[in-house]
A protein has these predicted regions:
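S-adenosyl-L-methionine
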Residues: 95-138, 146-147
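Conserved SAM-binding loop of SAM-dependent methyltransferases across substrates and taxa
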Residues: 76-89
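Non-catalytic substrate-recognition/targeting regions of SAM-dependent transferases
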Residues: 1-51
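Conserved beta-strand signature within the Rossmann-like core of class I S-adenosyl-L-methionine
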Residues: 161-170
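Conserved alpha-helix/loop element of class I SAM-dependent methyltransferases that forms part
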Residues: 50-66
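Short beta-strand element of Class I
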Residues: 90-95, 165
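A short glycine-rich, Lys/Arg-flanked "PGG" loop and its adjoining helix->strand segment in the class I
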Residues: 151-162
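Conserved class I S-adenosyl-L-methionine
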Residues: 66-75
Length: 175
């Protein structure tokens, strides 16, 4: 065993900062392969969402050949990389605020040899999405508990012919 860490709840701050404590070993750097897609991250700097594995797989199974896609909450590339590697998106515009997540996304893109089909827009997506008006066939809003604050901007990113918006949110079960 080289490393051991304890992951606490994801921080509620805007960057969704890591709450990992290294118990053994020093480096929090991790490289892994998920359904043929290579990811890299430093678990001490960015959060890792193990709970979205089913959705990552589902998104990777959608044929996006020839499509321009916007990922409004890119993180380390949870959905961006499967869209490029498995779904064969022509190009993905990935919006991300956290510099540590951006570094992980860049490393993942290099590992998967898709950097030429990826544009990363660093900053608050309330601003960066405004630069993507009318370019997308598909917009992905993969954030919990809700992506509602970006719905209008997401729709404005779609081409004039329309497209698909994937949105994530928690909903209450009504009895």
């Amino acid at each position: 065993m080289n490393r051991l860490a304890r992951q606490a709840e994801i921080s509620p701050d805007q960057l969704r900062s890591s709450q990992v404590t290294m118990l053994y070993g020093e480096s929090g750097e991790v490289e892994f392969i998920d359904y043929g897609v290579k990811f890299w991250l430093d678990v001490t700097k960015v959060m890792f969402s193990s709970g979205n594995i089913t959705e990552r797989h589902r998104i990777g199974n959608i044929d996006m050949t020839g499509e321009c896609v916007v990922d409004a909450f890119a993180g380390i590339g949870y959905y961006t990389l499967p869209m490029l590697v498995r779904s064969k998106a022509k190009h993905v515009y990935a919006c991300e605020l956290n510099p540590n997540s951006i570094e992980a996304l860049k490393r993942g893109a290099q590992l998967n040899e898709v950097t030429n089909r990826l544009t990363i827009l660093e900053g608050d997506n309330q601003e960066t999405l405004r630069n993507l008006t009318g370019i997308a066939d598909r917009v992905h809003l993969g954030i919990l508990p809700s992506s509602e604050q970006t719905w209008a901007l997401a729709v404005s990113c779609l081409k004039s012919t329309g497209g698909v918006v994937h949105l994530h949110m928690n909903v209450r079960e009504v009895e």
